[in-house]
Amino acid sequence: MHLRTLLPLALAATAAFAQTAKVSPEKEASMKADLAGQIDAMKKQAQVMVDSVFSFGELGFQEFETSKYLSGILEKEGFKVERGLYGIPTSWVATWGSGKPVISLGSDIDDIPQASQKPAVGWHEPMIEGAPGHGEGHNSGVPLNIVAAIAVKRLMEREHLQGTIQLWPGVAEELVGAKAYFVKNGLFKNVDVVLFCHVANNLGVSWGPSLNQNGLVSIEYMFKGESAHAAGAPWRGKSALDAVELMDVGWNFRREHLRLAQRSHYVISNGGDQPNVVPPTASVWYYFREADYEHIMDLWQKGDNMAKGATLMTDTTFTSRLLGSAWPGHFNKAIAEDMYENIKKVGLPTWSDDDQKLAKGLQKELGVRVTGLATKIQEMRSPRLPQNTDAEGGGEGFGNQPTGGGSDDIGDVSWVVPTVTLRYPSNIPGGPGHNWANGVSMATPIAHKGVVAGAKVQAMTMVDILLHPGLVKAAWDYFNNVETKELKYKSFIRDQDKPAIWLNQKTMEQYRDRMKQYYYDPAKYDTYLEQLGIKYPTVR
């Protein structure tokens, strides 16, 4: 197509986008008030979705019930749904609308191994001993996005606003297993802004990089030796398990000489069959975390060297495979600042005495500071400043040096399109994370109220993006001229790597039939707590 043809098309597209901005401040305020009212009217739908996904309790890559349920709701609302993207059976993307801007909403859906917990009970009481459960709160984010998207869709239809809404789930986030494949395969190539959300204990948003979030690679090392009778002829065996243990010992000695920012941890994923057989196969699964791409790759190389050394000591061989990866995030200033204005408009939920009683009861049980639920919104976090550290250089922050921490593969998305993460207050302060305690509130009024508040913020920010082309322009200006000016995204995924969709399959097969007995039935029960016969709250 010639430039002479392209230019009028580009101008027409810009004009069509700009037309949506011709709204008075009074009209815009009225639209946002209408959105808040719509979302309040959808409280019941939000509660049902949150409770239903909590009851499914599915681990990463095995979120079949969850994905079917959530994508089905969007389909009934008129969204076009594509399922099973990029070789990941539980992935999907839902779209509605046409033209620019394209606003993409994402949140995670998987849960935590061995985190089964009765909601609203302020001590450890699993529904099924050893089963997975939502000990991170990922049952709430996509319901939040669905409520926001439906409300904005109705507003767009009524006001004849142009734009496209896209929704997708973060599959296997706890394995950092999917978003890098979404990026690599172009899910976000036409997207203008990504609004992600994640459960927290307050309303908040931040911009820039973070000193206490790492990227990572997830690598499994698989050793191969030779079996033998462990008592009758051990000299004829070559123990793959010995190789695993020697690699782990070597890595544990090396930790002393690694940077403060690094975090590394492992589990032995195959330790052999039984003691009287020299293990011919064994494997160990590592997470190597660091603050940037180069240092992550350095840890990966060090891990490979440890594995090679272990094989030399044991006359074994090894292969390895990438199971997941994540970049450290860098979040957009323009969108975060706009979102924070909407956070101030919405404010925190009004917590009941029972809400506070559950929070304080759980905090007392955990032996942490008893503060109850947050009653004041967080301030916008400064870029590159860690949470809960001494900004003057003492304490855990070590001045302006990376301190390390967890990882989330939304980081990969943030390096290809302007992205922010909304934190919403559905959890109780003081939980250790990845733990039964973080699931206590997640099918209670605390979670429901937090989702409704978050949906209002998400929806209002979407309207700002629809009405103000300059906001998208500012977002991309920051993305191009600050975030990616000197640092460009390079995927950890190699051509031979595939999504590790077999992970957690055996665990879910072990528990799924028993878990089905606890699936929420909203046709019979008003809430999941009613179905379970749990008094709200139940505390000591």
Label each residue range with its predicted role:
Residues 20-134, 143-164:
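Acidic/His- and Gly-rich active-site-bordering loop/insert found
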Residues 245-540:
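Metal-dependent amide/peptide-bond hydrolase catalytic core
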Residues 1-7:
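Bacterial N-terminal signal peptides that target proteins for export
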Residues 53, 94, 105, 138, ...:
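Divalent metal-coordination and catalytic microenvironments
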